[in-house]
Amino acid sequence: MGQVKGETGAGAPALKVSGLRYEVADRMLLDGVDLQVRAGESAAVVGPSGSGKSTLLGCVLGLIRPTQGKVEVAGQDVVRMRQRALERHRSRYMGVVFQFGELLPELTPVENVALAALLGGTPSDQAYERAETLLRDLGVPYEGAPTGQLSGGERQRTAVARALINQPAVLLADEPTGALDRATRDSVTELLFDVPKRWGCALVVVTHDFEVADRADRCLELTAAALVPRKAGDRS
């Protein structure tokens, strides 16, 4: 796929979160959160339900406006962007994988993946060519059967391909293995954490599964509204 868009020079972070603060109904979910992830690097964020993990991803995506702080993706602060500019920036520089894939079941895998590129303005022939290449690389049968007939692992691989089709600077994954059996979880986990090295983007995985989190280059825990380092293998 080549060099990802949004690279800002050697060593520059693809994602930089600075002093992020968010509270709702007098409850502090994020209090001065900092996070930097560089191209080719992975970070996992763990924490109990309700700790603010998905809120953090929402702030990175620009779906939630923090009380204060900055979220720089590919060198630009999404917090201060107007809606239309934010949507363009998100489409160009961010890819997302959710727990249940969020794919259209009636479309084939190649149609699902190409659709994301078409919505981003890629010409049809290029969109389908890139979609087929990605799905082939990720081991997904892309012709014939609709996506709804694929196995859980194949659907998640299709979701990863869709997230990568626009060559994002940052790939975000929210509980991407939560609905999978153990064997399929391990396969999808291996695929996900291979993405930064193969495609050159930054990867942030939010998960409650410590075995998944341990595969990341860095593991952090969101606790008491703060993001703190966590040692690999620590289950306490």
Residue ranges and their predicted role:
Residues 167:
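Conserved catalytic motifs of ABC-family nucleotide-binding domains
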Residues 78-95:
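ABC ATPase NBD coupling module
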Residues 146-150, 154-156:
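Conserved ABC ATPase signature
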Residues 171-174:
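Catalytic Walker B motif of ABC-type/P-loop ATPase nucleotide-binding domains
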Residues 61:
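Helix-to-loop junction immediately C-terminal to a conserved catalytic motif
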Residues 134-148:
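Conserved ABC nucleotide-binding domain
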Residues 107-115:
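Short coil-to-helix segment of the ABC ATPase nucleotide-binding domain corresponding to the Q-loop/switch region
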